[in-house]
């Protein structure tokens, strides 16, 4: 893979996933702040967690820093793509573990989980975490082809 093609792949992946994580983080923060103020906003996949939104925002910023490095023709741009993807995967793994623990509570018949459903625990964290596998795999391929 030539260096110009790699740069284009890094820029496009970092832009797409940077936008996904940043916009989701901002929406999550806004919903969380409104719920703190007493207004109830419900959107599918969003739970209104301000700190979770900040985590998504941080991952989005890491992707955007990778765009800046790639535009400047810095080979370290792959590192930003790789790092942001790993952090996004970590967020997704945590969301998956929460889903599993809630499912166990439901299966054991705990009272708090009597009305639990799979789609109630399907959050933006889980979706973005699973999507972060795509840039992770591509960054891994790029880093192995440059060595």
From Swiss-Prot:
Signal peptide: none annotated. GO terms for cellular component: plasma membrane. It is a multi-pass membrane protein. The keyword Methyltransferase does not apply. The chain crosses the membrane at residues 13-33, 45-65, 80-100, 116-136. Its main location: membrane. Keywords: Cell membrane, Membrane, Transmembrane, Transmembrane helix. It is found in: Cell membrane. This is Uncharacterized protein MJ0565.
């Amino acid at each position: 893979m030539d260096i110009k093609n790699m740069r284009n792949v890094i820029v496009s992946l970092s832009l797409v996933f940077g936008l996904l994580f940043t916009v989701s983080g901002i929406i999550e923060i806004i919903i969380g702040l409104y719920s703190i103020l007493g207004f109830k906003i419900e959107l599918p996949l969003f739970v209104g967690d301000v700190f979770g939104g900040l985590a998504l925002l941080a991952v989005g910023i890491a992707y955007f820093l990778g765009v800046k490095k790639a535009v400047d023709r810095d080979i370290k741009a792959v590192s930003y793509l790789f790092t942001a993807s790993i952090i996004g995967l970590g967020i997704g793994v945590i969301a998956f573990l929460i889903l599993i623990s809630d499912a166990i509570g439901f299966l054991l018949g705990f009272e708090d989980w009597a009305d639990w459903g799979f789609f109630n625990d399907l959050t933006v964290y889980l979706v973005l975490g699973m999507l972060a596998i795509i840039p992770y795999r591509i960054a891994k391929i790029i880093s192995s082809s440059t060595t």
